[in-house]
Amino acid sequence: MAVYGNRHYDDALLEAVDILQEQGFTVPAAAAFVAEHSLTPKVGTGRPDARDMVAVGDFSQNVAAAVLSACCSTVTVPGNRPYRGLPPVVDIRPKTSQSCTQCMLCATNCPMQVISFDDAAKISQGCIRCCACVRSCPEGAKYFDQEQVLNIVNILEKNCLTRREPEFFVAGA
């Protein structure tokens, strides 16, 4: 399963299927779901929504039927081999305004654990710009204003507003 912010999931499903197969798993199904983009709430707004949830229900029934019918093949998913290369790593960290109350919700919610629990303004290298800290801050004190991030937001808001639908893949279907 891949969750993405209404742009594209690139090779994520293929990479996941490959990793699981390398570990000896048969992967009968895969899906790419749309969620609100982490950098801007204007892209993928309100997703997943009721329409998505109906599609998820239908997909889960198809997967259950495939598994119960002793489906033993691995699903074919889109993607590229070799996988699309990663862009160069750029050390961009969120900033913290004076309105920070040191509640530490940002540190608690950071999946990379790069925000210090001693001082929310101290952020180690390793931020993936998921914006969990920005979204969890009750004071709006966490933010990104770096040119690189703002440029990406502008590109997303210009090119990725059209609704994309979840994509589902079931072996033998």
Regions found by a protein language model. Name each.
Residues 96, 101, 105-122, 126, ...:
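Iron-sulfur cluster-binding cysteine motifs and their immediate structural context
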Residues 22-39, 102-111, 115, 131:
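Amphipathic repeat-derived elements
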Residues 1-89, 145-153, 158-173:
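FMN-binding flavodoxin-like domain, especially the glycine-rich phosphate-binding loop
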Residues 74-111:
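A mid-sequence, solvent-exposed acidic-amphipathic segment
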